[in-house]
Amino acid sequence: MKVTAGVDEVGRGSLIGPVYAAAVILNRSINIKLLKDSKLVAKDKRELLSNYIKKNSIWAVGKASVKEIDKINILQASLLAMKRAIKKLKKKPSHILIDGNKVPDLKNYNLKAVIKGDQKIPSISAASIIAKVSRDKFITTLARDNKGYGWDQNFGYGTKQHLKAIKKLGINKHHRKTFSPISKFKSHNI
């Protein structure tokens, strides 16, 4: 029997925190009409959908840390997070569809990249939603302990508010040091 998993990552463009990926094998009972790319779903609905997907699928989340991102670059870190999510699945899929144009290096897996897969393939859309909700929860926790950066609203992306806060407060251990404009700022708080 063919078992397909969808995989997507979130947080590549953020200036802070880990990059997250999720792998999802949908149950046949799930209503795929509800599944869309996480960027197209309102936050409150995204959280409800994440819970619905988790109850009606086999899923796993993987991540790559800020240190890993700075050491191996964001593309390789994204692929590493995907690899970790795939390997954490409780069931090995016979096919894995990955959003984008690159696939992680995984032997003994049938991997296929699908450009804009998060908009075309329900299992990739589901992975997008789970990864986004998981990362957003983590970043919201970071925001409570790192006041002043507005991470609870900008989630670490390079908004005017965030860049202004960096100029005032400096960068800290959660910032990706190799990312522009972070690499241009002197560290105050590390």
Predicted feature residues:
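RNase H-like, Mg2+-dependent phosphodiesterase core
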Residues: M1-I190
